[in-house]
Each structure stands twice: as structure tokens, then as C-alpha cells.
Amino acid sequence: MSQSRFKTFKDLPKEHLLGTGTAMCAGCGGLEALHEIYDILGEKTVIINAAGCMTLLSVYPYTPFRGGWLYTSMASAPAGAQGVRDAMDILLAKGRMSTAEDMETVVLTGDGAAYGMGLSSTSGAIERNLHFLYLCYDNEGYGNTGQQTSGATPHAARTATNRGVVGYPGFKKDLFAIWAAHEPAYVASVIGAEPLDLARKVDLAKNIHGPRLILALAPCPTGWDFEPEETVEIGKLAVQSGVWPLKEYRNGQIKHTKIPKKRIPVEDYLKRQGRFVHLFEPKRNDSLLQEIQTRVDAYWSRFE
């Protein structure tokens, strides 16, 4: 990561721009990340918000956003961003908007849209080299409708649609790699529990032209089944166990920005969440736990 104005925690914004009193769940990891990201982006943003948890932020006639906000269907937020960006570019070209009035075009979606329903429109937007920032809060399920399985659901997790003794039999898609395969301007994974790493990446992305993704793991007390006050700790465990690598893609290169000095066992992360309780009770499922650990170890063996 290039030199950043955020060198220590003292450099982080002291106050949040995003308003309070929203209808979000207590301890929402997505809202935690959004607060931090919005502080860096500033008020001159237009949020194109796909259907999902975060649409509860702007319940008419109230909104916590200080800039523009547009609601779209789950699959069409990048198309909405194209319209917003095109409209502003036309106004700029005709002199009806000054460069000082120009605004950042930001798509805001959950993993249901980012990994699944909206992936085709996202791919098209990247191929058109649309100048937009895509922000995904990844709570690893369709959280707004009861935590059904999504393309981001991890192996063996219990969801509303996979309640068996082994949980979800499939595997989480690698959205970071899918975006990187398009050769966009920038891709970064972040988490609200690591605010300095997050701030540096968002600040960098803000000053890059083209399609950019900020992919934020969003620990979800409601869907993952843990207490709201544990959100930050769960987030740190995701990083320390190696389950959620913090990295960035730029100019064809991938760089890890925070490598755990000594990774903790993955089960230390899993056992704190009710969605994985079936791996430990009433009988420990050593084979599934080892399978999950082996996949994490295999990932890091390529970089260590």
C-alpha cells in the first residue's frame, strides 16, 4: 500500500458523518465498516443502495446520509451507478456542474447482490470501465430476509436454508479473485475491526479512477448468532485465524496488508458463533473442522 495520510489511529476521523438512530441491528459489522468508510469518502457521495440490510438506513422520510442516495433492486445497483455517473458527466461537459460539485458514485450492496444476483451487472460495469466504487458488506448470507444461504456463505455454516448436521455443504465464492480477473483499477478486502487498514485502503481507492471494490467482512450478531458487543472481537478473530485475509489488488499485483504473525486455530473463530455450534455439540465433528482448517492453511501456504 502506498504512503497514506493515516499513519496511526490518531489520524483517523474523530467524528462520524453518518447519522445515528437507524433501524440496523445492534452490533452490525456492516454498519461498523460503513461508518468508517463514509468518514473517509466524505459528504460528496451518491450512494446507489441495492436491496438488502442497508436499505433500512434510509426509511422514508429520514436518512443518515449527508449526500445523495438512490435505491435499486438487488441485481441492478451497478446499472443505477452507470446512470448516475453518466448524468453527472453530461452536466460537467455542458458546464452545468462544476468539478467542485462532482460526487463519488458509490454502489452499496450486501453479499447476496455482490456474489450472486447482481454479479452479471457488476461484471458489465467493470468491463465498461465505469468510474465507481463498489462497497460490499459481506455478512455471508441473505441477512435482510433471515440469513438464507448466499454465494458468500462459508463451508459448514448453519443458515435458514441449510440446517442439517453438516450445515452448508458448498464453499464461499472468492469475490476478490472474480473482480481481480476483470483487471479493474483496485480491489481491497477490509473489516471494521481493523480501522487503520480500512482507512488507508478507502483513502487510496478514493483517488483512483475506474472500477474499485471495497469488500468488507461484516460480522452479523443476528445471522451468525453471537452477542452484539462481540462484533469487534469476532472480526479480529477472523483476521487472526487467517479466515479473512486483508489484501489489495492493483496493477495486476496482489499484496497482503496485514499478515497474522502467528495464526490462531480456525476453531477459535468458529466456536464463538452459533452458526457453527453443530461442529462442537453434541459431538465434535473433527473431520469437518480439519477440512476447514486445511483449506485456510492451503491458502496461506502460497504466501508464507
What are these regions, as identified by a protein language model?
Residues 113, 193, 219-220:
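Catalytic metal-binding/acid-base residues of hydrolase active sites
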Residues 136, 188-190, 213-217:
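Short, conserved beta-strand edge motifs with alternating hydrophobic and charged residues
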Residues 3-134, 147, 152-155, 165, ...:
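Cofactor-binding active-site loop characterized by glycine-rich and histidine/acidic residues
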Residues 54-55, 139-144, 221-223:
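Short gly/pro/ser/thr-enriched loop/turn and capping motifs at secondary-structure boundaries
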Residues 198-304:
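Glycine/aspartate-rich loop-and-adjacent alpha/beta segment that forms the canonical ThDP
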Residues 38-45, 85-91, 170, 180-183, ...:
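Structural signal for hydrophobic packing residues in well-ordered secondary-structure cores
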Residues 9-12, 101, 150-208:
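Conserved thiamine diphosphate
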Residues 15, 27-31, 74, 78, ...:
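Electropositive phosphate-/nucleotide-binding environments in soluble metabolic enzymes
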